[in-house]
């Protein structure tokens, strides 16, 4: 069975995200890995509305927005050296990296 790694990268700052993705792809190309991506996933927008004053004036409100940008990289044919390299990478604060390993069954026709 083959194993694929799905790498989800999330960040609030788009420039930080692109720098992290570039770093990932450069490291993976050095190890001659087969990969798909980076695939741009939809941006998540969260809006928060709060009252400006603590007691009165319900009409006076403030709006805040939080945007989360995401990218997906799929690594095919995982090797132990690739896994060590992936876990050894360090990224700047504000970037969240999730690794998921899935087994792919080969179908013979």
Curated annotation (Swiss-Prot):
Gene3D superfamilies in the record: Ribosomal protein S10 domain
Alphabetical UniProt keywords: Ribonucleoprotein, Ribosomal protein
InterPro entries with a match to the protein in the record: Ribosomal_uS10, Ribosomal_uS10_dom, Ribosomal_uS10_dom_sf
SMART domains reported in the protein's UniProt record: Ribosomal_S10
Record-level GO BP terms: translation
One of the record's GO molecular function terms: tRNA binding
Assigned GO CC terms: ribonucleoprotein complex; ribosome
Pfam families (alphabetical): Ribosomal_S10
Membrane-spanning parts: none
Assembly: Part of the 30S ribosomal subunit.
Known role: Involved in the binding of tRNA to the ribosomes.
Recorded family membership: Belongs to the universal ribosomal protein uS10 family.
Name the record gives this protein: Small ribosomal subunit protein uS10
Provenance organism: Wolbachia pipientis wMel
